[in-house]
């Protein structure tokens, strides 16, 4: 596994992070997002993203910027598939399109900020390392039902490979957990995410997602049948 074979979007983003801004790379990343989302429906509800861009997301060595690049890739993917989306950065500095990892990981405060806007769902996108007030996210998550807050909150783990050990990277184990390490997992992650939304927006997304997937499978079958 390398930094650049976990999907085209994150591969371009890794190069941007490691080599500095390039108009050509930025355009290639944008095109990769468009191609990856072309056949997906749009979720019409309100989505809040708590995006971890704290210092720990930089990592080091061969994995430098890898988890962060995959998190940003997922964010750009979501931005194309969500009609109403708001991002709450945890740490980070510089360009909002390509934030540099910096600062502490205070996921709890960002979650509270996100919930104030009453979204249909909150996705916490993080590498799982909580280095500010450890345990606060778990306490906040556990207290939400007592505060009559029933907004679905899902923890989305950004990984380097499918074999990453997450045992020490679950700051709120009671939250529903989704994992991703490759761009190919994004569509199913969206399906899992929005299936937790109550109401018509979630139902509509699931229905359109499955219909588009069925149509794609039928087209693939027709091509295969014609060539055999």
Language model features with spans:
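Acidic, glycine-rich A-domain
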Residues: 2-228
